């Protein structure tokens, strides 16, 4: 009888342990698959493609790659003598047409004063027409001069904002064309996170929720706030054929891959001071309305938080 009781006790303990193991595995699976977190997150920043608005030789590139620059700082200088000469020519044209217009204005005024007793009405009208033509040429010359001034001003390319110069691939002496990208400027204080959360993890996610960001291969924990969720993503299962009809890819009903949706997370100000390079990877955990305290939660929850941040 005693042996039977011991046997029953062992079986009961075994069943209880198995049941607890199943519950733990189930909770871990739910926690892993449904809680709002992802390892697929990228540091992102506003990047300005710096391209000149004029064409010519680069005469000065006072930069080094990955340099921090201030708004208004000179980035590129392009062939100023050529554009200074163009402005001088435009000024000369304006001066010429101003003199010519003054002369034609006096001549037309004299003919009007003399009137038809001294000359024909046709000659008077002809003088007025010549004056109008010269005045139009003067207006065109003035407009050309203003464009020459603008071109000369734009031979000096300046930083549109504070930020870091990166991927500098031009040097003094090279010929650069209008609109060709010379360098990229990563705006300071513009860093944010794009966290690609599976659609199954978006339930309950709200603007203003707090987030923890752990860069790949780092123990540093950064913080941010959910700003927005993408309003749409590309539907890879549907295209439009040549007749305008939808073409739907075949899909196995028992195999459905969750679509990833970009969630924009704004970094806290203190983390903007020392951001990771744009394009690098991070793990993101949405903690709800408040930041997660390091000593809060059950040991199981804390363990799961730690495990999923390896990456």
Swiss-Prot record:
Q: Does the keyword Cell inner membrane apply?
A: yes
The SS bond pairs are: none
Alphabetical GO CC annotations of the entry are:
plasma membrane
Q: Which SUPFAM superfamilies match?
A: HlyD-like secretion proteins (SSF111369)
**Which GO molecular function terms does the record list?**
transmembrane transporter activity
Keywords annotated in UniProt: Cell inner membrane, Cell membrane, Membrane, Transmembrane, Transmembrane helix, Transport
Q: Which InterPro entries match?
A: CusB-like_dom_1, CusB_D23, MFP_Efflux_Pump, PHBA_efflux_pump_AaeA, RND_pump_MFP
One GO BP annotation is: response to toxic substance
Which is a Pfam family this sequence falls into? HlyD_D23
What is the first-listed, main subcellular location in coarse terms?
Answer: membrane
| Transmembrane domains' residue ranges | 11-31
**Domain of life of the native organism:** Bacteria
Location in the cell: Cell inner membrane
Membrane topology, as annotated: Single-pass membrane protein
The entry assigns this protein to a family as follows: Belongs to the membrane fusion protein (MFP) (TC 8.A.1) family.
NCBIfam families under this entry? PRK10559.1, RND_mfp
Functionally, this protein is described as follows: Forms an efflux pump with AaeB.
- Put simply, this protein is called p-hydroxybenzoic acid efflux pump subunit AaeA
Gene source species: Serratia proteamaculans (strain 568)
């Amino acid at each position: 009888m005693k042996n039977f009781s011991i046997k029953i006790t062992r079986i009961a303990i075994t069943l209880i342990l198995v049941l607890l193991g199943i519950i733990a595995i189930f909770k871990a699976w739910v926690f892993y698959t449904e809680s709002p977190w992802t390892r697929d997150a990228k540091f992102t920043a506003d990047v300005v493609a710096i391209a000149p608005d004029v064409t010519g030789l680069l005469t000065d590139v006072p930069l080094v790659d990955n340099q921090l620059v201030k708004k208004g700082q000179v980035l590129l200088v392009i062939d100023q003598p050529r554009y200074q000469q163009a402005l001088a020519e435009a000024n000369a044209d304006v001066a010429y047409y101003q003199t010519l217009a003054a002369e034609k204005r006096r001549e037309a005024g004299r003919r009007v004063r003399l009137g038809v007793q001294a000359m024909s009405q046709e000659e008077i009208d002809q003088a007025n027409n010549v004056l109008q033509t010269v005045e139009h040429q003067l207006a065109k010359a003035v407009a050309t001069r203003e464009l020459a001034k603008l071109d000369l001003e734009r031979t000096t390319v300046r930083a549109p904002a504070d930020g870091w110069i990166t991927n500098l691939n031009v040097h003094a002496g090279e010929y650069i064309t209008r609109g060709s990208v010379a360098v990229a400027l990563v705006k300071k204080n513009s860093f944010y996170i794009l966290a690609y959360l599976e659609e199954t993890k978006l339930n309950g996610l709200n603007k203003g929720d707090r987030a923890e960001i752990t860069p790949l291969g780092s123990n540093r924990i950064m913080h941010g706030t959910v700003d927005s969720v993408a309003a749409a993503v590309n539907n890879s299962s549907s295209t439009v054929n040549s007749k305008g009809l939808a073409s739907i890819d075949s899909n196995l009903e028992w195999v459905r891959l969750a679509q990833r949706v970009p969630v924009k997370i704004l970094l806290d100000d203190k983390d903007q001071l020392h951001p990771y390079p744009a394009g690098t990877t991070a793990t993101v955990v949405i903690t709800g309305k408040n930041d997660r305290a390091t000593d809060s939660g059950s040991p199981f929850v804390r363990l799961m938080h730690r495990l999923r941040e390896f990456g």
